[in-house]
């Protein structure tokens, strides 16, 4: 079955996914290719609900490839339908990292414009983070604590699962 890399934005899903398989599936990148605009622009034009629908459709398609390494966006767990799909997948790997580390990573990543980060205060962002934690943990079949580990170390842990 597919290996799904779960975690909040900034957890390292894309970086680790590329190490595990250069042809891995980054759902955000695939959606951007499909819609022809950035996710931030899509949020403004179509709204978050429309984005979450596209995300669910993409997840359904990708889960058909049993050998895939898939990196969904951090909000994949918000949609109950996505959680149902993921609960049937035996390899959901949660890349766990604390809020302050994530916040610092995202704040320092000038190349990636993340709508939920840009449009919320730190306190509001923390509430989103706290709301998703139990969802990640409930769906995870494996939890990898990634703080103080290099992407290569994280990838090696995942290979051993």
Regions found by a protein language model. Give the residues of each.
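ATP-binding Walker
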Residues: 11
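NTP-dependent small-molecule kinase module
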Residues: 3, 19, 65, 130-161
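Well-ordered beta-strand positions
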Residues: 23, 68, 91, 141-142
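ATP-dependent small-molecule kinase phosphotransfer cores
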Residues: 27-75, 80-87, 122, 126, ...
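A glycine- and Lys/Arg-enriched "phosphate-lid" helix/loop adjacent to the NTP-binding pocket
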Residues: 88-133
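P-loop (Walker A) phosphate-binding loop of NTP-binding proteins
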Residues: 8
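Short glycine-rich anion-binding loops that position phosphate/pyrophosphate groups of nucleotides
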Residues: 74-76, 98-100, 149
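Walker A/P-loop
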Residues: 14
């Amino acid at each position: 079955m597919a290996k799904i890399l779960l975690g909040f934005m900034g957890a390292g899903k894309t970086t680790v996914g590329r190490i595990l398989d250069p042809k891995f599936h980054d759902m955000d990148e695939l959606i951007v290719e499909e819609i022809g605009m950035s996710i931030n622009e899509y949020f403004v034009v179509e709204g978050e609900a429309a984005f979450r629908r596209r995300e669910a459709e993409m997840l359904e398609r990708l889960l058909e490839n049993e050998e895939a390494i898939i990196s969904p966006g951090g909000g994949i767990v918000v949609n109950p339908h996505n959680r149902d799909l993921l609960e049937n997948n035996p390899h959901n790997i949660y890349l766990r990292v604390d809020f302050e580390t994530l916040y610092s990573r995202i704040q320092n990543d000038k190349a990636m414009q993340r709508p939920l980060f840009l449009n919320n205060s730190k306190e509001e962002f923390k509430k989103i983070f706290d709301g998703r934690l139990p969802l990640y943990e409930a769906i995870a079949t494996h939890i990898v604590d990634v703080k103080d580990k290099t992407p290569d170390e994280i990838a090696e842990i995942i290979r051993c699962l």
